[in-house]
């Protein structure tokens, strides 16, 4: 077992800057761009004016893992992770999130590290590291990164496992989309059925009164 801190180092803090009134700011990913499937949602990405000079290492690279530091709720713990595979040197991440970047990709496959964190979150592994304040759930990020451990296996096995998991997730997401599309088809029919039912009930009552 290897500690996450030895794989990625401490989580880098995000940037927020100031309002972009000119439309030429830097796109910044927020927790609203997180999905529960670990995929980045690029809808409604905000742009911000960030003037710090030492942010070059914070531009997102392929294989970066973004972890949620603040957010969540009583039903949804803080600590979600998303895997970044978008265009490099384009996006930053905000101050409610942190960046985990694998140091040695010859030893650790970033996708494997992501899946380990993703699975740990799904089983509630971040809850012991929550610090609740008024209306907010904060992740004790440094503590979590220092104590969380990942099973060390050869790189080729890491890649093979991730290929299998990617395929499984692809099938799951496809099924979810099919179910969602089916719901969209069924809802109008259900609405029609309810209208017809009300008409039958109304007309049935009228007929009964007319007979009496």
Language-model features and meaning:
Residues 1-14, 149-162, 174-212:
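Non-catalytic DNA-recognition/assembly elements of restriction-modification systems
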